[in-house]
Each structure stands twice: as C-alpha cells, then as structure tokens.
C-alpha cells in the first residue's frame, strides 16, 4: 500500500509547482478597492488563471484579501485545477523598499487514468522589492505545502492492485520551495507584470518535472 501511495503521489508532485499568485505594486495604491487579475504562465504546463482581491487601505499595514482560480491547458475541463484564498500584507516600508508576505489556503485536484487526487495545502511567500508609482521589481521566496491528500483510484488501477484503498492520507504528501524575481509597469489603474524563477522540492535534492515557473499577468483596479 505504501508503494501505491508513493507512486500516486508522484503524479501529485506535478501539481505542487504552482506559483501563480497575483503581483501588486504597493507604491501605486490609489483609492481603488477592487483588483481583477488575469494571467498565463508555465509551471507543470501552460496554466491560465483568474483572480480577485479586495484592498484594505490600512495606513500602517496595507493588505489585500482575495481568491484565485487556475487551470492547465488540457482536453478535459476541470479534471485538473487549483483554487487559492488568503491575504497579502505589506509590513515594512523604508523609502521605496518594501517587504510583504502572502499566506493562502490551497485546494488542488489532479486526475489521470490511475487516480483522482485532491489535496488541501498552504502557500506562503515573502517579497522584498523596490516600488515606484510607475514600475516595480522584487525578489520572492515561498513554500507550497500539500498537507492532507485524498486518493480515489480508478477501477482499472484497483483491478491491478486490489489491495489499494481510497481515502484521506497524512502526513503531508510533499511540498516545494520556490524563488524568483518579479517586475512590472503601472499605468493609470492597470498593472502588467512578469515573474519567473526556480522550484525545488522540500528535501532540496530533487526538482519537479519542470523545475521553473514563468508568469505574465494583468491587473485592473476599480
């Protein structure tokens, strides 16, 4: 049974490389409260995403709360997807240098001919950047962790391995550290940004099938 879980978890590892969080220019806060986001990127494949954030203009610690949804390109819609919800807080501002952190709960689903896998996890990241009203750039370090995972094996797989069992399993299946750079340009009530970087598993020894991520995104503020 342990071997079965391990083999199935390898498929899940393709989904852990998910770094499509919204990028914000903290120096261009404005009075807008709503941020709509669309993005496209390459993680474990080509990924399309949409997001919404509500901005809280706290003078000391400005923050956004929101949700995101992404899906990879594929033949069957909603076989694989990821949903995230959480908060992004700017903690420190020294002249034009700013530091922020992001914490999001994550739900992922992945399905192939052997199993349908779903997990709940946590994505945490910190960004140090230089922010101007018209442009910004920074570096990001984060950790994406799968905490508890549900396995539902296909009938075909159960015929081959009749001892396999469906259900929730813990401890955590695994996680990835990711690090990279990001930058963007702001005009009026809109942002265009690019982010890219590398991914490594939590044991610091192995890398995912695609050990890097790239994303292009667009924000519209209302």
Feature map (PLM): residue ranges:
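Extracytoplasmic loops and strand-loop junctions of Gram-negative outer membrane beta-barrel proteins
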Residues: 32-36, 108-110, 161-167
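Cleavable N-terminal export/targeting peptides
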Residues: 1-28
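Short glycine/proline- and aromatic-enriched beta-strand/turn motifs that initiate or cap beta-hairpins
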Residues: 21-74
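Membrane-embedded beta-strand positions of outer-membrane beta-barrel proteins
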Residues: 36-40, 63-67, 99-103, 124, ...
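Outer-membrane beta-barrel transmembrane domain signature
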Residues: 115-204, 220-222
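Transmembrane beta-strands of outer-membrane beta-barrel pores
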Residues: 40-44, 54-56, 69-73, 89-91, ...
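Residues that define the transmembrane beta-barrel architecture of outer-membrane proteins
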Residues: 32-34, 44-48, 79-83, 116-122, ...
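Outer-membrane beta-barrel domain signature
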Residues: 25, 37-43, 72-78, 111-117, ...
